[in-house]
UniProtKB/Swiss-Prot annotation:
Biological source species: Schizosaccharomyces pombe (strain 972 / ATCC 24843)
Region (Disordered): 1-94, 155-177, 233-297
Biological role: General activator of RNA polymerase III transcription.
Key words of the record: Activator, Nucleus, Transcription, Transcription regulation
InterPro entries named among the record's database cross-references: Homeodomain-like_sf, SANT/Myb, SANT_dom, TFIIIB_B''_Myb
Quaternary structure note: TFIIIB comprises the TATA-binding protein (tbp1), the B-related factor (brf1) and the B'' component (bdp1).
Subcellular location: Nucleus
UniProt name for this protein: Transcription factor TFIIIB component B''
Length: 520
């Protein structure tokens, strides 16, 4: 019974990223075995045969000897200690050679048919010279290349490798790369080999979409949107090309016109013709007007107004208006009661061709809690804006509305927040700006704020006129109040001086009847 020890180099012994390898036995299955060379010579108890193990772990390592010596021993009953001693010695020798090479790379092993066939045909008596050995190792390096990224392993196994330098278009290269990635994933599904070349594989190769699995609804919508965009661009490009071609055709037709015709047209200018009208139309118009005048006698002004209102009403059916209308009935203007009723369906009706259809979804338009808000995006305050803020603060005080006019991109809320922030950070400077007042330059303020202010003299004249008018109205009001007070006082005096009705008694004698009391 024979066994083979598979040794692989490791990184530093204390590194926690070093991959771990364990010895395993070869399984007899349909899979291809690891390449090794054997000599068909009988073994005795004291003889040990050395073989060349060709593996990916040592194909690209920078070692002086390209072949690592391993031991294939046979369990012999005669001298078991010698075989175990030779095995341990060879393992130690391999470890020394491999630890001396710091530039080692880990990759996924691959087994090919061509090097197997080349090795199987070697006879036991074959002697590899130095040149033959170099040629043989070049062929092995060609098939056992470690510097292959993960996304191209399937291409290497097939013996094909696409690259951007080929004559294929970019589109075909992209499709072939996607196929390679999907094939790689399909090949590795359910297998135990999950080793990745960490020195060569990029994160983008692992994050790329291999195009395997069921498409989601979001992916389908994105594909549809991209297709519509490409289609619109293509139609626009075709329209521009057709317009340019038609323009070129028109220019060619104008250039190809005979020169003589153009000269004749230029030499004989055409007279401008005015179309006044045709005799038939004039005759028909005159006959129609005569028939109308004979059939309908001259209408009154009210009847003509009623006809005009009816025509306007028919024309305004499309443009619905909720204003009340009037009509003429028996020579009188009467309010149309039907116009007082408002039909909301007719009012809100919009023709189909004038409607604007807007399709909104989460892909084309993101709707969040801040979508319908009016909050402006805050901007950072630099040193220049801060100095400008302190200058405005010393001019206008804490009137943040006037200060906000000096900053077109900011509102009153942002100015107030800036004031609170500066009051916490630098209260001494804020107090100094509020105590020391600076003169106000209206020209600079109007230039910065974009508002036009009239001169102060005109404003003072207007204020003086307003004051005079106010004083005059006040004087008139006082005079009117005094007159009213005089009238009230006069009435009170008359009431006081008038005799009381209870003191005087009137007597009326009618037919011997005496009436005592006041006669009303």
């Amino acid at each position: 019974m024979s066994s083979q020890i598979l040794t692989s180099p490791t990184k530093k012994s204390m590194s926690r990223f070093a991959p771990k390898f364990t010895a395993r036995r070869e399984k007899v299955s349909d899979q291809k075995e690891v390449v090794h060379e054997e000599k068909n010579q009988p073994l005795t108890g004291n003889e040990v045969e050395t073989s060349a193990q060709l593996s990916r772990d040592t194909a690209n390592a920078d070692i002086s000897s390209p072949v690592v010596q391993t031991v294939v021993h046979k369990e012999a009953t005669e001298n078991p200690t010698a075989s175990s001693y030779r095995k341990d010695d060879s393992v130690k020798q391999n470890e020394k050679l491999l630890h001396s090479n710091p530039t080692f790379k880990i990759s996924k092993p691959t087994v090919l048919e061509q090097p197997l066939n080349a090795i199987e045909h070697l006879s036991p008596e074959t002697d590899l010279s130095s040149s033959a050995e170099q040629q043989f190792m070049k062929e092995l390096d060609l098939f056992f290349d470690e510097n292959i990224p993960l996304s191209q392993l399937s291409a290497v196994s097939d013996g094909k490798a696409d690259s951007p330098a080929t004559k294929k278009s970019r589109r075909s290269y992209r499709e072939s790369s996607l196929k390679r990635k999907s094939q790689l994933i399909l090949e590795n599904v359910g297998t135990d080999e999950k080793i990745i070349n960490i020195s060569e594989t990029k994160m983008s190769a692992l994050c790329d979409d291999p195009g395997i699995g069921r498409k989601s609804q979001r992916f389908i919508e994105l594909e549809k949107m991209l297709f519509e965009e490409k289609r619109a661009k293509r139609i626009k490009k075709q329209g521009a090309s057709t317009a340019s071609s038609s323009r070129e055709a028109s220019l060619d037709s104008t250039i190809k016109q005979p020169l003589s015709a153009s000269l004749l047209e230029s030499s004989e200018p055409k007279e401008k013709e005015e179309i006044v009208g045709s005799l038939e139309e004039e005759g028909t118009d005159e006959s129609a007007s005569l028939e109308d005048s004979l059939s309908h006698p001259t209408k009154s002004i009210l009847d003509q107004l009623a006809d005009k209102m009816e025509v306007d009403g028919l024309n305004n059916n499309s443009n619905y208006s909720a204003t009340p209308r009037t009509r003429v009935v028996n020579g009188q203007i009467v309010l149309d009661e039907t116009s007082l009723e408002v039909d909301r369906h007719e009012r809100d009706f919009v023709p189909a061709e004038e409607r604007e259809y807007v399709e909104e979804n989460s892909l084309s338009r993101r709707v969040t809690s801040a979508t319908w808000g009016n909050r402006q995006k805050p901007e950072k305050w630099n040193a220049m804006d801060t100095e400008k803020f302190y200058k405005a603060l010393s001019q206008w005080g804490t009137d943040f509305a006037l200060i906000a006019n000096m900053f077109p991109t900011r509102n009153r809320r942002q100015i107030k927040l800036k004031f609170k922030q500066e009051e916490r950070r630098n209260p001494a400077r804020v107090n100094q700006a509020l105590k020391i007042k600076k003169p106000i330059d209206m020209e600079e303020y109007s230039k910065v704020s974009g508002k036009v202010f009239r001169p102060v003299e005109e404003m003072e004249k207007e204020l003086q006129k307003i004051r005079e008018n106010f004083e005059e109205e006040r004087r008139r009001a006082i005079e009117v109040a005094e007159q009213r007070q005089l009238i009230v006082n006069h009435e009170l005096e008359q009431e006081k001086n008038a005799p009381s009705p209870t003191d005087d008694k009137s007597y009326v004698f009618e037919d011997g009847v005496e009436v005592v009391g006041q006669v009303v």
